[in-house]
């Protein structure tokens, strides 16, 4: 069943791409006993996190946030197109895809196994800083992780190249405004969507392990290309979200993936939307 929440005049629906198996070993700067305790224990460190996508309509257009992993990562992922169809939404009906960052679990699902667009009519909204970094040429000094993701991102973006809108902070399309929150990736973006206080943020991977990083926002993960910068972005953005009482749609926040932050101790707690 599709879950939805209301933010002002927007009805935001959550669509799962599936479950990503990861590891508590990827937590940086917290001892193992504490991180195990926060997630309620693991079997040999295995941690299972959701890959959430969101969709809403505005002015007769259908806008989706991120595109899932496709068939490229784990068999438990790549469920997004099927879940859209099950809800009566043909992927060809999607007009815009807002991208938080161009990592495999958010962008590899843009294309099918043959490299054809799964969303043939969608325009991509992405921060220029993120797009330019991943579309740049690699050289001998480029870390392997970056080189591989760049190579894959050429495949992801190829059928969309004529309809990519490179945006910067302050730009707006249908109420969607990017706010640079770098660190996890160089142009990682928190999108503010809606009007005034009747807005929500799609915060991408600002928080990767929600059971740990919302209550302990100083804690980074090895997925962050620059963990210190990611930490600063997280602290700054969580503060803003809590101050403004904005609703949150989190790419890897445990079910239902959306809700509100409140301050608790030196961190925050997450109240799921009803
Ligand atoms: Zn992610």
PLM region descriptions:
Residues 63-65, 98, 124, 200-202, ...:
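Residue-level marker for buried hydrophobic side chains located in beta-strands
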Residues 17-19, 67-70, 102, 129-130, ...:
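Active-site metal-binding loops of divalent metal-dependent hydrolases
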Residues 196-274:
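Cap/insert and terminal regions of metallo-dependent hydrolase folds
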Residues 78, 85-86, 93, 120-180, ...:
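Metallo-beta-lactamase
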């Amino acid at each position: 069943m599709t879950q939805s929440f209301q933010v002002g005049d927007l009805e935001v629906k959550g669509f799962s791409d599936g479950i990503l198996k990861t590891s508590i070993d990827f937590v940086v700067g917290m001892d193992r006993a504490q991180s195990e305790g926060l997630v309620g224990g693991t079997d040999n460190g295995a941690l299972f996190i959701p890959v959430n996508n969101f969709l809403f309509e505005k002015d007769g257009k259908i806008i989706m946030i991120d595109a899932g992993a496709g068939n490229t990562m784990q068999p438990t992922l790549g469920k997004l197109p099927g879940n859209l169809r099950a809800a009566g939404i043909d992927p060809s009906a999607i007009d815009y895809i807002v991208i938080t960052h161009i990592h495999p679990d958010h962008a590899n699902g843009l294309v099918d196994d043959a490299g054809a667009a799964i969303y043939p009519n969608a325009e991509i909204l992405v921060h220029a800083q993120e797009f330019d970094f991943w579309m740049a040429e690699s050289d001998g000094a480029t870390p392997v992780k970056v080189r591989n993701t760049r190579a894959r991102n050429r495949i992801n973006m190829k059928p969309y190249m004529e309809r990519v809108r490179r945006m910067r902070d302050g730009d707006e399309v249908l109420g969607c405004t990017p706010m640079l929150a770098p660190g996890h990736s160089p142009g990682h973006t928190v999108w503010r969507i809606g009007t005034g206080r009747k807005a929500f943020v799609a915060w991408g991977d600002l928080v990767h392990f929600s059971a740990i990083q919302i209550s302990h926002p100083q804690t980074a993960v090895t997925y962050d290309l620059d963990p210190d910068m990611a930490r600063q972005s997280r602290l700054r953005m969580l503060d803003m979200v809590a101050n403004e009482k904005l609703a949150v749609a989190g790419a890897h926040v445990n079910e239902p993936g959306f809700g509100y932050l409140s301050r608790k101790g030196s961190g925050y707690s997450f109240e799921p939307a009803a």
